[in-house]
Amino acid sequence: MARVFHVAEKVEIPENVAVEVDGLRVTVKGPKGIITRDFSHARGVFIRLEDRVVIVETFVADRKQKALVGTIAAHIRNMITGVVRGYRYKLKIIFSHFPITVSVDEKNKVVRIRNFMGEKSDRIAKIYGNVKVKVSGEDIIIEGVDIEEVGLTAASIERATRVTDRDRRVFMDGIYIYEKGEAL
């Protein structure tokens, strides 16, 4: 099989977005905010800015390096989408007998879940990064510019209400992700 020595992937930059590349550190600025990400763990990968295009490339193209180039390009695309449109996850509060109360503590960056399965103590889920969490009725809406922080926060809330020692087909109480995508 022929060996490929150069693999590059290009990411187009929209007009209302500014991208700065400093070695393997990429900063993306847009209407919704700023995201900085360090890709210094990626050995043998180079990132450069040319006109309105970010080029991610490698010159030693084995299977892992090819995958790494694609992964970094996808991360940069997600960063651009985040600063232009943002990301939103929606979670549903589901209970059958004990009414669950959810409140957001902005100061301590946590979500407090009260009366889950009739428990006396609160369950606590962490809010990651600069993510906005809003509770409206039986829905929890999580919005932010970094897809990883939004996803981590949603997973933290879902994991905090996991039912362990009961049959999940019967005890369906909890908070579950039902929609995720771009916030428009």
Curated annotation (Swiss-Prot):
Gene Ontology MF: a single term? structural constituent of ribosome
* One cellular-component annotation, GO: cytosolic large ribosomal subunit
Q: Does the keyword RNA-binding apply?
A: yes
Classification via InterPro entries = Ribosomal_uL6-like, Ribosomal_uL6-like_a/b-dom_sf, Ribosomal_uL6_a/b-dom, Ribosomal_uL6_arc
Which keywords accompany this UniProt record? Ribonucleoprotein, Ribosomal protein, RNA-binding, rRNA-binding
Q: Is Ribonucleoprotein found in the keyword set?
A: yes
For this protein, the record's Pfam families field holds: Ribosomal_L6
Domain of life, source organism: Archaea
Q: What does this protein do?
A: This protein binds to the 23S rRNA, and is important in its secondary structure. It is located near the subunit interface in the base of the L7/L12 stalk, and near the tRNA binding site of the peptidyltransferase center.
Family label: Belongs to the universal ribosomal protein uL6 family.
Q: How does this polypeptide assemble, per the annotation?
A: Part of the 50S ribosomal subunit.
Quote the protein name from its UniProt record.
Answer: Large ribosomal subunit protein uL6
| Annotated source species | Desulfurococcus amylolyticus (strain DSM 18924 / JCM 16383 / VKM B-2413 / 1221n) (Desulfurococcus kamchatkensis)
